[in-house]
UniProtKB/Swiss-Prot annotation:
Membrane-spanning intervals of the chain: 44-64, 94-114, 148-168, 186-206, 224-244, 255-275, 281-301, 305-325
Any one cellular-component term (Gene Ontology): Golgi membrane
Protein name: UDP-N-acetylglucosamine/UDP-N-acetylgalactosamine transporter nstp-4
Keywords, sorted A to Z: Golgi apparatus, Membrane, Sugar transport, Transmembrane, Transmembrane helix, Transport
Location, primary (coarse class): Golgi
Top-rank lineage group of the source organism: Eukaryota
Function: Uridine diphosphate-N-acetylglucosamine (UDP-GlcNAc) transporter in the Golgi apparatus. UDP-N-acetylgalactosamine (UDP-GalNAc) transporter in the Golgi apparatus. Apparently transports UDP-GlcNAc and UDP-GalNAc simultaneously, and independently, by an unknown mechanism. Functions redundantly with nucleotide sugar transporter srf-3. May be involved in gonadal development.
Alphabetized InterPro entries for the sequence: Nuc_sug_transpt (IPR007271)
Lineage of the organism: Eukaryota, Metazoa, Ecdysozoa, Nematoda, Chromadorea
Subcellular location: Golgi apparatus membrane
Disruption phenotype: RNAi-mediated knockdown causes no obvious morphological defects. In an srf-3 mutant background, causes accumulation of oocytes in the proximal gonad arms and abnormal gonad arms, such as twists and overturns.
């Protein structure tokens, strides 16, 4: 039993560290791709999402193929047994469509919010997803959070908001905000809040599926990627169809962009590992720390970021919140007696 607990703890730690490294590498590669001078049109992020989901599918198929002794028939038998064999397995597979659909809704809400809000309001408000994730973890998974945990989550939300706050000229921010009237702001805030709840619900729902089912992580990722591909293609059609028609699906792609796509694809698999062996709340802390690490590295190496006082305060708050969340409060004599 202790060996199983040790293995689970090791997998939790390893998956969190890998997530921090992967997210940091992804952000830095994205920043580097923005500094590249390229002839012709830039690549479309919507098509990159489609490519990433397809790569996830191929990778998961290969892992199952390998686990079955590199036998194609063995892979097909496992897929049939876990996904198609009975009405129960088919219904179970459809459960994964819920987070996939929620992610599509979330992305569309964020597209809408970006058109209605200035960057500062959008970035700060969207950090509420940290709190909605915690709320759904308590209500859907029965997770118990101490007051120290809630304090840490509130501080984390505030710290990430400060880190992500745009560092541009204040007069520019004011003029940009002035372009949006009151009704735009209300609609934009409503869209961001809805996206926060969508993000929290989808993440925790997928966590519940992973932790309450005997279906392998790779099968679950195949199911999620399958539904996500259709969602990503829908976004391409809604927002970038004209550009794709004019310049092609892979317009603007080069070596760096393909690295971004690969990091995005395998990042999705790492997130699934984190959700299975840790949880969505710890995932939020890992991603927050990677934002700070990538920003600092970008300032140090690429020189495309200015470290402001706001960023420094936010980074300090995030680090403090991380330690506070890991704080184990001493039990009172009464609690110790009851235990």
């Amino acid at each position: 039993m202790n060996r199983a607990n040790d293995t689970s703890s090791n997998l939790k730690l390893i998956s969190l560290v890998v997530l921090i490294v992967q997210t940091t590498a992804l952000v830095l590669t994205l920043r580097y791709s923005q500094t590249q001078k390229s002839e012709g049109p830039r690549y479309l992020s919507s098509t990159a999402v489609v490519c990433a989901e397809i790569i996830k599918l191929i990778t998961c198929f290969f892992v199952i193929y390998r686990n079955n002794g590199y036998r194609f028939s063995g892979m097909l038998n496992e897929l049939n047994r876990e996904i198609f064999a009975s009405p129960q397995t088919r219904a179970d597979s459809l459960k994964v469509a819920v987070p996939a659909i929620m992610y599509v809704i979330q992305n569309n809400l964020l597209f809408f919010a970006l058109k209605k809000l200035d960057a500062a309001t959008y970035q700060v408000t969207y950090q509420l997803k940290i709190l909605t994730t915690a709320i759904f973890s308590v209500t859907m998974l029965g997770k118990s959070l101490h007051r120290y945990n809630w304090m840490a989550l509130i501080l984390l939300t505030a710290g990430v908001a400060l880190v992500q706050y745009p560092s541009g000229d204040s007069t520019t921010s004011k003029s940009t905000a002035a372009e949006h009237d009151a009704s735009d702001n209300i609609l934009g805030l409503g869209a961001v809040l809805a996206a926060c709840f969508s993000s929290g619900f989808a993440g925790v729902y997928f966590e519940k599926i992973l932790k309450t089912s005997k279906v392998s992580l790779w099968i679950r990722n195949i199911q999620l990627a399958f539904f996500s591909v259709f969602g990503a293609l829908l976004v391409c059609w809604l927002y970038d169809w004209q550009a794709i028609s004019d310049d092609g699906f892979l317009r603007g792609y080069n070596g760096v962009i393909w690295i971004v796509v690969l990091l995005q694809a395998y990042g999705g698999l790492v997130i699934a590992l984190v959700v299975k062996y840790a949880d969505n709340i710890l995932k939020g802390f890992a991603v927050s720390l990677s934002i700070i690490l990538s920003s600092f590295t970008s300032w140090l190496v690429l020189g495309d970021l200015t470290i402001t006082t706001t960023f420094a305060i936010g980074a300090t708050v995030v680090i403090f919140a991380t330690f506070l969340y890991g704080h184990e409060p001493k039990s009172t004599p009464a609690e110790a007696h009851n235990a």
